[in-house]
Amino acid sequence: MAIKVLVVDDSSFFRRRVSEIVNQDPDLEVVAVAVNGKEAVEMAAKLKPQVITMDIEMPVMDGITAVREIMANNPTPILMFSSLTHDGAKATLDALEAGALDFLPKRFEDIATNKDDAILLLQQRIKALGRRRMYRSSSLTPTSTIESRRSTIAAPETNTPRRPLSSRLASTTTPVATRSSLSTTSADRHSANPTTSSISSIRASGKQYKLLLIGTSTGGPVALQKVLTAFPANYPHPIVLIQHMPAAFTPAFAARLNTLCKIEVKEAENGDVMRPGCAYLAPGGMQLMIERSGISGRLKVISGTQEMNYKPCVDITFASASKAFGGDVLAVVLTGMGADGREGARMLKSVGATIWAQDEASCVVYGMPQAVASTGISTHSISLDNMAEAILKESSRG
């Protein structure tokens, strides 16, 4: 049965084109369109769509207000369309905090010119959000309660890469991988649905860590906010965050996290020397590498090859960390589409690093975490509600 979609936008052109694109996919069906947030709230209650696409700036009622009302009364997966501006980034983050699950840049030229990748991406995102049941987390931030959802593994966010990942990682400016380090092992035959580890079952390893890595995609802004706001100002290690996000969005996201967290959060800059208690967010549209500099680490921001599906790419950063810090790394893969992070995590594990994944039930999209959990790369699958406590418990021994 096709996933029922409600399209909300005050632009008649955008409503028509989004509806056409959605209806091109036999697994999707537009059941109605709305011209403002007020109509969206009413139609969500009446029609019970499985996914809503939502504009932000609309008359009568804006998209953010509509998201709040829908999530309060008829919780539904919502995909926001956002302009690639500083104000657009801030508004999108507000919408995600209000309960929207994902966003896409609102590019009229892509929609108008029938760009295949833009069409496929929209269809994939809607299908990923439509394959889920409700999951209610405890309060995700000091200021709001956000909904999370469960889903089956979703398709990648973009088309199939032109070259194997091993060669694409090797083509970055810092050698980070060998073909043998990417080979499939017996761990790849592990269960596709690992059980969730309780806090009591996670025993601190006593390892002396030097770095915490967190990689994520769809659902990541809310998940990162929940985890990082629980960290004390004196968290003992540097933190590197890799979130799939456009270049216009990462400065605003880093600034928002910095205002909410006790630790310092900043967008990573080329040459940054990593400090304990500071989180460095990979800049959108670039690749973030980690290099060893004495007893600490230094960050290198590069443009990277165009053949990588993601900028920033979790695999790239994880792989560079395996070379720079070896086993002295705790790496966590949170909610996200696709499998970015799996091969980088495999490299980290091969040198003795600790890998954890978010559990299926608390993910917005169980793609990236499943990629490391089902292959046996991660040692624990942990609920988002327990992730910060688990990280602090493990880090305290470092």
Swiss-Prot record:
Cite the EC number.
Answer: 3.1.1.61, 3.5.1.44
Positions of the Response regulatory domain: 4-121
CheB-type methylesterase domain mapped to chain residues: 205-398
Residues annotated as carrying 4-aspartylphosphate in the record are 55
Q: Name one GO biological process term.
A: chemotaxis
Note the InterPro entries from the entry. CheB-like (IPR008248), CheB_C (IPR035909), CheY-like_superfamily (IPR011006), Sig_transdc_resp-reg_Me-estase (IPR000673), Sig_transdc_resp-reg_receiver (IPR001789)
Where are stretches of biased composition, namely Polar residues? 136-146, 168-200
Q: Which GO terms describe its cellular component?
A: cytoplasm
Instruction: Name the UniProt key words of this record, in alphabetical order.
Output: Chemotaxis, Cytoplasm, Hydrolase, Phosphoprotein
Check the record and name the CDD domains matching this protein.
Answer: CheB_Rec, REC_CheB-like
Q: How is it modified after translation?
A: Phosphorylated by CheA. Phosphorylation of the N-terminal regulatory domain activates the methylesterase activity.
Question: Which residues are annotated as active site?
Answer: 217, 244, 340
**Gene Ontology MF, one:** protein-glutamate methylesterase activity
Location comes to: Cytoplasm
Q: Which residues form a coiled coil?
A: none
Q: Where is this region: Disordered?
A: 133-200
Catalytic activity, as annotated: [protein]-L-glutamate 5-O-methyl ester + H2O = L-glutamyl-[protein] + methanol + H(+); L-glutaminyl-[protein] + H2O = L-glutamyl-[protein] + NH4(+)
Role according to the record: Involved in chemotaxis. Part of a chemotaxis signal transduction system that modulates chemotaxis in response to various stimuli. Catalyzes the demethylation of specific methylglutamate residues introduced into the chemoreceptors (methyl-accepting chemotaxis proteins or MCP) by CheR. Also mediates the irreversible deamidation of specific glutamine residues to glutamic acid.
Q: Which family does the record claim for this protein?
A: Belongs to the CheB family.
What does the UniProt entry state concerning the protein's domains?
Answer: Contains a C-terminal catalytic domain, and an N-terminal region which modulates catalytic activity.
UniProt protein name: Protein-glutamate methylesterase/protein-glutamine glutaminase
Q: Which species is listed as the source?
A: Shewanella frigidimarina (strain NCIMB 400)
Where is the organism placed in the taxonomic lineage, from the top?
A: Bacteria, Pseudomonadati, Pseudomonadota, Gammaproteobacteria, Alteromonadales
